[in-house]
Curated annotation (Swiss-Prot):
Protein name: Kunitz-type serine protease inhibitor microlepidin-3
GO cellular component entries: extracellular region
PROSITE patterns (alphabetical): BPTI_KUNITZ_1, BPTI_KUNITZ_2
Source species of the chain: Oxyuranus microlepidotus (Inland taipan)
Subcellular localization(s) per the UniProt record: Secreted
Pfam families per the UniProt record, alphabetical: Kunitz_BPTI
Length: 83
């Protein structure tokens, strides 16, 4: 195979890796936890991954405790949990 063909193959494999969704078996276990508002009342917007919806969803967070399925931004949630 020529070097141009190898570069094309490498580029296609890289693109496939980037675009391939995270499978549920590769997703961290904390992504399966339910949204948890926590006991505090410093209400703010946060994001959690919803296994049922297969996407990150905004919810109201109380500001303390809760669980690990809690992200400040949609991007953080998608990076950790979403496909």
């Amino acid at each position: 195979m020529s070097s141009g063909g190898l570069l094309l193959l490498l580029g296609l494999l890289t693109l496939w890796e980037v675009l391939t969704p995270v499978s549920s078996k590769d997703r961290p276990k904390f992504c399966e936890l339910p949204a948890d508002i926590g006991p505090c009342e410093d209400f703010t917007g946060a994001f959690h991954y919803s296994p049922r919806e297969h996407e990150c969803i905004e919810f109201i967070y109380g500001g303390c405790e809760g669980n690990a399925n809690n992200f400040n931004t949609l991007e953080e949630c998608e990076s950790a949990c979403a496909a």
